[in-house]
């Protein structure tokens, strides 16, 4: 990326989409970061945006936001099928771009966007915000400090209890919908950050709820030479499931509950305010004799994604989520789907050059 914004200049941001993700995550996180100015929102519901963001201009179409001359950064938080076409439009307009996860619908779209961003010398990043979750940061610290020895079994769950199918695009049979494309990117990205690319992927993806049109359950195994990673998400888990369970060759660690930042944002808590990101659910490490010892869970802070985006645009640091890392997530997403469809073990379809960039 060669197009660096002059240090000290406020970065004007256009947010495309003001549904659940745009309203709950992107808007408040952007507004909490000094140096970022949420200038425009593209939404068909101007009244909703004006009620929440009275000082922000609302435009009816993404094209108006993308082509506005004052906009430096375009954040795409619209439905998954629109990610690639809108990001393409924004990159061609010379804008810096953040895309919500999943990056795109498939690897081809992702590679096309990466090539276009390189051609235009603009920043392209993907919103893998759960790198800054308290639960993940706590587990990461335990592993890196050697408290459980060498990891042999790593299990990551994001489970919910929503037995009733809701009328929303994520639960309809449309491109990019389903639970695996919704929650899979989070748990894949965290696993890849910890362990790198797997040797192979085994996926089992299903539709279990009565009346469901698209997958609402996924169980995926990432195979590594010395350990196994299990990624699981479900809409039919009322309780009794740990967020993380990790077994090493000298001890084990459990994190029971998920990071609280989403629930805080839904409650209207301002990012960075008192108690933001705090997690009262301790990590529990079990020693070789099975005795538990609690360890305080660190604070989460998803603001860090946009703080680091701001710094990257000012030339102070690198892109916090380079697009090749999001491409790797897409590769695992696709491998799991293909494995589930065919009943076979799959490898991750990345080129040697892409793999080298991930080292």
Spans of features found by a protein language model:
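Rossmann-fold dehydrogenase core element
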Residues: 112-129, 150-154
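Contiguous beta-strand/loop segments that form the cofactor/metal-binding neighborhood of enzyme cores
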Residues: 189-271, 303-319, 336, 352-359
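Beta-loop-alpha module in the N-terminal Rossmann-like domain of NAD(P)-dependent dehydrogenases
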Residues: 56-115
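C-terminal helix-rich "cap/oligomerization" subdomain common to oxidoreductases
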Residues: 1-10, 73-75, 308-359
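A short helix->loop->beta-strand "cap" motif at the edges of active sites that frequently abuts
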Residues: 56, 93-95, 120-122, 224-227
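N-terminal Rossmann-like dinucleotide-binding module
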Residues: 1-53
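Active-site loop of classical SDR/Rossmann-like NAD(P)-dependent oxidoreductases
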Residues: 21, 293-307
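Predominantly a Rossmann-like dinucleotide-binding segment in NAD(P)-dependent oxidoreductases
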Residues: 130-211, 219, 343
């Amino acid at each position: 990326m060669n197009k660096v914004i002059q240090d000290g200049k406020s970065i004007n941001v256009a947010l495309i989409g003001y549904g659940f993700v745009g309203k709950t995550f992107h808007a408040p996180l952007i507004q909490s970061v000094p140096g970022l100015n949420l200038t425009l929102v593209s939404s068909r519901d101007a009244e909703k945006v004006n009620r929440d963001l009275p000082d922000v201009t609302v435009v009816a179409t993404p094209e108006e936001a993308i082509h506005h001359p004052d906009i430096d950064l375009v954040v795409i938080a619209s439905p998954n099928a629109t990610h690639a076409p809108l990001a393409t439009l924004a990159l061609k307009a010379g804008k810096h771009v953040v895309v919500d996860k999943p990056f795109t619908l498939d690897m081809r779209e992702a590679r096309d966007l990466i090539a276009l961003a390189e051609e235009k010398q603009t920043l392209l990043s993907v919103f893998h915000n759960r790198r800054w979750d308290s639960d993940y940061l706590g587990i990461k610290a335990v592993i890196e400090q050697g408290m459980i020895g060498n990891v042999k079994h790593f299990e990551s769950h994001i489970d919910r209890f929503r037995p009733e199918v809701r009328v929303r695009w994520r639960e309809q049979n449309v491109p990019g919908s389903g639970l695996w494309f919704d929650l899979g990117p989070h748990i894949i990205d965290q696993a890849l950050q910890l362990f790198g690319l797997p040797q192979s992927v085994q996926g089992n993806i299903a539709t279990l709820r009565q009346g469901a049109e698209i997958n609402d359950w996924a169980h995926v195994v990432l195979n590594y030479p010395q350990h196994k990673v299990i990624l699981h998400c479900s809409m039919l888990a009322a309780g009794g499931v740990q967020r993380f369970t990790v077994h090493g060759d000298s001890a084990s660690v459990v994190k029971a509950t998920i990071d609280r930042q989403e629930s805080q944002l839904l409650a209207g808590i301002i990012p960075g305010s008192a108690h933001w990101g705090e997690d009262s659910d301790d990590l529990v490490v079990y020693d070789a004799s099975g005795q538990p010892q609690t360890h305080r869970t660190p604070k989460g802070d998803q603001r860090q994604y946009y703080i680091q985006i701001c710094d990257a645009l000012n030339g102070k640091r690198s892109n916090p989520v380079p697009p090749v890392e999001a491409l790797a997530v897409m590769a695992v997403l696709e491998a799991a789907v293909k494995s589930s469809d065919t009943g076979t073990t799959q490898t991750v379809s990345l080129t040697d050059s892409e793999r080298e960039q991930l080292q």
